[in-house]
Amino acid sequence: FRMRVRYLEQPDNKQISFTPLICMHCVDAPCLKACPSKAIRREDDGRVFIDENRCDLEKECVEACPYGAISINVEKEVAEKCDFCTHRTEVGLDPACVSNCPTDALVFGDLDNPESRISKLVDKKKAKAWKAEEKTNPSVLYVSHEKWMEEKANTGVQLDPKDEDVTYEQNNLKK
């Protein structure tokens, strides 16, 4: 499913957030421009898709993504990322993360339809783009996030380093 949930501790240690990070399916996707093998393309519905058959694992896409959303599948030797569960959404189902979220915190829908549930929530909750300064025009928006979350999210999971059962990740490199 290629979603990473980052455990982020606020700098003053008064708040902990579990923040899901997925591919933002950017309108101006840096990964698409960076891929030398043209394995990344935009679908008609706006999704950014990696064709595993064309991926030559040059890794430029991994470096180009400002959200850290692309990882390397070492077994298949390809880059991969969230595709909004195309296999589900093509048959009218929500992505797995949305349908399995116990708190209903994830919403999927058509942002171009002002009557859709997601469009109404975006307006009501004042949802914002993650790392708006990157000017990628992402299709994924967040409610109630703060700048400190963005700054910590790509650096890995911030947990007690004495906890040996924790796997720290940074761009799919296990530490």
Feature-to-residue mapping (PLM):
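Non-ligating segments of multi-cofactor redox enzymes
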Residues: 1-175
